[in-house]
UniProtKB/Swiss-Prot annotation:
Entry function: Involved in the import of nuclear-targeted proteins into the nucleus and the export of poly(A) RNA out of the nucleus. Has a role in the endoplasmic reticulum-associated degradation (ERAD) pathway.
Family the UniProt entry places it in: Belongs to the NPL4 family.
Residues covered by the MPN domain: 253-390
Gene name, Swiss-Prot/TrEMBL: NPL4
Keyword Transferase: no
Name of the protein described by the UniProt record: Nuclear protein localization protein 4
GO cellular component: endoplasmic reticulum membrane; nuclear membrane; nucleus; perinuclear region of cytoplasm
Location of the region described as Disordered in the Swiss-Prot/TrEMBL record: 596-653
Places the protein is found: Cytoplasm, Perinuclear region; Endoplasmic reticulum membrane; Nucleus membrane
Organism: Phaeosphaeria nodorum (strain SN15 / ATCC MYA-4574 / FGSC 10173) (Glume blotch fungus)
Main location: cytoplasm
Keywords: Cytoplasm, Endoplasmic reticulum, Membrane, mRNA transport, Nucleus, Protein transport, Translocation, Transport
Length: 653
């Protein structure tokens, strides 16, 4: 029979079977509506207004015959356009179901959300708000200016020729000369835009960036049943040809001070176990490469985790949103993750074993999948992509031993192909860290799910020097799935947080934890608190871990907390004076003063503690960038013995 449909876009007719259900018709309806329509919002009603409108997606199992529709019946459609949120995000679903209708248990869900489905946004350059840094780089010319060549240029001082004219930021000769391996994101954007949009052709503007999409498209216009019941060449992904990514979303990682990283390494020095932390900072322009971007790391927050000698297991992070909000009020955001992979060389000189090198691996397949999930969670909003987002600024840093036995940092990002292949569940980590496995559709029945795994290929240079294409199944090298970044420290450090030592959170395993006693000492509560109208007083409270602990106490009001975070990050004496005269600050000092200093907790020797001076500095390491703070003439083992001796004497008293 024929049904007539009326919407604000016009009228159309569809031929249906009486026993067909409403959701089965959604694909045919989508073909008649604009591409910007959110299919989950399409409603159907028997009246243009005032009728009982129902979402088609919710009418599962309801056939046209059941509701009394006959040949020639007229229905009215309503719908909304896809969300045009400022950053291109969409609300993630709160639950999920398997193909057989069984609810997916929470334990089976991925630990890190993979972001919203890819949806095309109409005129993204009008509705997407990107970061101020991206707006700034968009306005820049980006050309690489060159001086007049005295040997090759024959023109006058005001002339210009091929030897001195400005170069495009993606000029291959310049990048090779400066040994720049990857294009910056904005250089890559200029390159693809110049090829896709040519003003001389007079054609309409097309967003130059397109994110890879390796999943079966749910809104296929062919009219068949949704996958896995139906699939065609229009909705199935094509074969994937992997190649090294020529650009990177972030070019450089800058740590505000050595102490930021050294605090994380000290956990391994004291316990021998690995440690992970999230990087909080901001993004700035990086002038060492054309139109570059750098991540400036101001602090590292260590979430709840189980630490082992050879790995880390993340626990439930209950106050994750609160920490992100505190960072935001300090002008920071989460920019990446860092973790250690260190093994003492047992030489007694602080050296470590080099585990990651050209003959083993630099970033394991498991770490690439981990990085890809977080990059999917934090996409980069951009108005130059048809989906309103492209790639991610999230970086992954690894602290491990270098080829000289010293502790060094390496920075990486998973490629956009890797992120999408993880989203599509095409690849999975291997027990061999240097290779990534391609999933097999043969496992679908055992896993009670349906996946379409496209063909995956990669190109390599074979033993005869020829460039050949290889099938990636069952595994392929991980080098195709990540890009390397540079890193460093400023020559003149000017960190945002200038406070002294304060116990770092979630370190109970090594006997370190923030408490009111430590806070009272830091705020000098016995002497009625610090003078917050002085530079020294402001510097003392400028510690991110201290700010998080004060927030957890719940003593200050929201306005007082906001003022505290502002004072700690801006070091404004007038704001500090205002904070000192608030009622909440006075209450906090009174509580700390009345609580007094608690006696130190007894220290217990841990089997994982090393008595060999793990990671300690030795005379040849004075100029090392990553160094162990000096503890006088005593070694780590002597210091540990003294602490244990002092604890035992106090226990006898």
């Amino acid at each position: 029979m024929i049904l007539r449909f009326v919407s604000k876009e016009g009228q159309f007719r569809l031929t249906v079977q009486p026993d067909s259900t409403f959701p089965e018709l959604l694909a045919q309806i989508a073909e008649k509506l604009p591409k910007s329509v959110d299919l989950q919002s399409v409603t159907v009603s028997n009246r243009p207004q005032g009728g009982d409108a129902r979402k088609i997606s919710e009418l599962k199992g309801v056939s046209f015959k059941q509701v009394g529709l006959s040949h020639g019946a007229q229905l009215f459609l309503g719908f909304e356009d896809q969300s045009t949120a400022s950053n291109g995000h969409a609300t993630a679903p709160t639950g999920a179901n398997r193909l057989n209708g069984k609810v997916v248990e929470a334990s089976d869900m991925p630990s890190v959300p993979l972001g919203s489905p890819t949806q095309v946004i109409k005129n993204p350059w009008e509705v997407v708000r990107q970061s101020p840094l991206d707006d700034k780089l968009d306005r820049q010319d980006g050309k690489i200016h060159r001086k007049r060549d005295a040997r090759m240029c024959t023109h006058g001082p005001k002339g210009m020729c091929d030897y001195c004219m400005p170069l495009e930021p993606y000029a291959a000769a310049y990048l090779a000369e400066k040994k720049i391996k990857h294009l910056s994101f904005h250089s890559y954007l200029r390159k693809v835009n110049s090829a896709k949009n040519r003003p001389e052709l007079g054609s309409s503007y097309i967003p130059p960036l397109t994110e890879p999409y390796y999943r079966v498209r749910p809104d296929c216009p062919s009219g068949h049943k949704p996958f896995p019941a139906g699939i065609c060449t229009k909705c199935q992904p094509g074969a994937i040809s992997l190649k090294p990514q020529e650009y990177r979303m972030v070019d450089h990682v800058e740590f505000a001070s050595i102490q930021v990283v050294d605090d994380l390494i000290n956990f391994w020095r004291n316990t021998g176990c690995q440690r992970l932390g999230f990087l909080y900072g901001r993004y700035e322009e990086y002038t060492e490469v054309p139109l570059g971007t750098k991540a400036v790391v101001e602090t590292i927050y260590e979430p709840p985790q189980v630490n082992e000698l050879d790995g880390i297991s993340l626990g439930d992070w209950d106050n994750e949103k609160e920490i992100d909000e505190i960072a935001a009020q300090c002008g920071l955001q989460r920019v990446g993750v860092i973790f250690t992979d260190l093994l003492d060389a047992d030489k007694g000189d602080g050296s470590v074993i080099c585990k990651r090198h050209i003959d083993s691996y630099y970033l394991s397949s498991l770490e690439i999948a981990f990085a890809a999930r977080y990059q999917a969670k934090y996409p980069r909003p951009t108005k130059w992509s048809e989906t309103g987002k492209f790639g991610s600024n999230f970086v992954t840093c690894v602290i491990s031993g270098d080829d000289q036995g010293q502790i060094g940092i390496s920075s990486y990002q998973a490629s956009n192909d890797a992120v999408e292949m993880v989203r599509a569940d095409i690849i999975e980590p291997s027990a061999e860290p240097s290779v990534m496995l391609v999933q097999s559709e043969d496992d679908n029945e055992a896993l009670n799910r349906a996946r379409y795994i496209p063909e995956v290929f990669y190109r390599r240079i074979n033993e005869h020097g020829a460039n050949v294409q290889e099938n990636a199944k069952p595994d392929f090298p991980v080098e195709y799935l990540f890009v390397t970044l540079t890193h460093g420290f400023p020559t003149q450090p000017n960190p945002l947080f200038t406070g002294g030592k304060f116990p770092i959170e979630n370190r109970e395993i090594m006997g370190e934890m923030p408490d009111v006693s430590a806070l009272g000492k830091s705020l000098n509560a016995k002497a009625n608190g610090l003078a917050l109208n002085t530079t020294s007083g402001l510097n003392a409270i400028s510690n991110f871990h201290m700010l998080c602990f004060i927030h957890n106490l719940g003593i200050l009001s929201k306005d007082e907390e906001s003022l505290l975070f502002k004072v700690a990050s801006t070091h404004d004496t007038s704001e500090g004076s205002a904070l000192q005269h608030t009622g909440g600050w006075a209450t906090l000092l009174t509580i700390l003063k009345e609580s007094g200093e608690r006696p130190p907790k007894r220290s217990y020797a841990s089997p994982s503690f090393s008595a060999t001076g793990r990671g300690a500095a030795h005379p040849g390491e004075k100029n090392r960038l990553m160094r162990q703070p000096s503890h006088g003439s005593d070694s780590d083992s002597v210091q540990l013995a003294k602490r244990l001796k002092g604890a035992s004497l106090k226990g006898k008293e």
